[in-house]
């Protein structure tokens, strides 16, 4: 591909130098518009058709979809543009200055995962777009680190249906084909406070929560008995009761109690199914104490994800890398992209470096990642 792009390391440097933090704290949260425009300019310069879309319900956040080649199917290479915030006191380098030392590239987003776009652009130097028989898409999303709003919106609104997708999260170039989902909720009981000398004049929220927890533990057993997937180390959905707070003094009837819990569902269990099971489990408490129990989301939920084990994407990637696909415990945008086409999570850098001070990617990943991207484009866009 004829290119007027900067060298690989300069692409990387520019990506890292462009802050794109997403955070639930509005004081730390930033727009990714500058970074999206940077990517859109580069892909546009080398002949891609580029669309930049605002993500509804966000504060100045954008997705970018770049396409080259015509027809149906093809390959989608995807990644998120945002990073987590950084702890200034724990970094020994400037997070926004790409620093090379001891065969490592340091900077916020080097591994997770802005650098992936530099790898894609670099691999495209060897691709002749006139030889593509199917389209190549590149997706850059917003807010993966917080709400996954970018990937959700894209999966719900796009018309494209590639043959397959690869999300370039840092997996140390080990292909990942499944992970559990995550749903976290606050269960809040509103009681009636009063002096402990006369329990009849109050409603003790801790006692009601005790009832609620007993029903939740029954649900935990139900999840274990009803759902099973042997590819996971723990082959059933898990439930954790992680935080509880209620009351303020030994001599007062507790007026309010709140429990924070999570469920990690298997692939195939919908978020609506989980919501229904949770509401059904707590219904006896709600019915006995009308208006006193509420369930709310702590974080936007993420479904489980599994790429079909017999799909060509898996066999091609396993053969190229000489390694088998893996199952992981963390969550990605894969369940949303998977609604469009079979999806693998596969990229350079280690997940151990993600969200860490002095985040880095080992330069040993550069050559094999470039080769892998070229090979998958050849496999899925030339045939």
UniProtKB/Swiss-Prot annotation:
Q: Give an example GO molecular function.
A: zinc ion binding
A Gene Ontology term for the protein's cellular component? cytoplasm
Q: What class of enzyme is it?
A: hydrolase
Give EC number(s), comma-separated: 3.5.1.16
Alphabetical GO biological process terms:
L-arginine biosynthetic process
Signal sequence extent: none
User: Can you tell me which residues bind Zn(2+) 1?
Assistant: 80, 112, 169
Q: Which PROSITE patterns match?
A: ARGE_DAPE_CPG2_1, ARGE_DAPE_CPG2_2
Name-wise, this protein is Acetylornithine deacetylase
What's the source species for this entry?
A: Pectobacterium atrosepticum (strain SCRI 1043 / ATCC BAA-672) (Erwinia carotovora subsp. atroseptica)
């Amino acid at each position: 591909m004829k290119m007027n792009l900067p060298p690989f390391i300069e692409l990387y440097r520019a990506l890292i130098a462009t802050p794109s933090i997403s955070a639930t704290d509005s004081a730390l949260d930033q727009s990714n518009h500058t970074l999206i425009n940077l990517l859109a300019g580069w892909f546009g310069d080398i002949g891609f058709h580029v669309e930049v879309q605002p993500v509804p319900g966000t504060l100045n956040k954008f997705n970018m979809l770049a396409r080259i080649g015509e027809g149906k199917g093809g390959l989608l290479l995807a990644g998120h543009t945002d990073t987590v915030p950084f702890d200034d006191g724990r970094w020994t380098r400037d997070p926004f200055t790409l620093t090379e030392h001891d065969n490592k590239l340091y900077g916020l987003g080097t591994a997770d995962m802005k650098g992936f776009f530099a790898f894609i652009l670099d691999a495209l130097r060897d691709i002749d777009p006139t030889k593509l028989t199917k389209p190549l898409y590149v997706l850059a999303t917003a807010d993966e680190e917080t709400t996954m709003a970018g990937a959700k919106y894209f999966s719900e609104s796009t018309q494209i249906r590639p043959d397959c997708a690869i999300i370039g999260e840092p997996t140390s170039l080990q292909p990942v084909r499944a992970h559990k989902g995550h749903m976290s909720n606050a269960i809040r009981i509103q009681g009636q406070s009063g002096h402990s000398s006369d329990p009849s004049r109050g409603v003790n929220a801790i006692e009601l929560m005790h009832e609620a927890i007993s029903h939740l533990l029954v649900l935990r057993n139900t999840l274990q008995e009803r759902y099973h997937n042997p590819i996971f180390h723990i082959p059933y959905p898990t439930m954790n009761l992680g935080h509880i707070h209620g009351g303020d003094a030994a001599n007062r009837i507790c007026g309010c109690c709140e429990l924070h819990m999570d469920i990690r569902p298997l692939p195939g269990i919908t978020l609506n199914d989980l919501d229904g099971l949770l509401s059904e489990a707590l219904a006896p408490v709600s019915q006995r104490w009308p208006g006193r129990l509420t369930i709310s989301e702590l974080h936007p939920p993420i479904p489980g994800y599994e790429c079909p084990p017999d799909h060509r994407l898996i066999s091609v990637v396993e053969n190229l890398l000489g390694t088998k696909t893996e199952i992981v415990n963390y969550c990605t945008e894969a369940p949303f992209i998977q609604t469009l086409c079979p999806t693998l999570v596969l990229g350079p850098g280690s997940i151990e470096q993600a969200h860490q001070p002095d985040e880095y990617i080992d330069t040993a990943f550069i050559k094999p990642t470039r080769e892998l991207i070229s090979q998958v484009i050849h496999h899925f866009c030339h045939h």
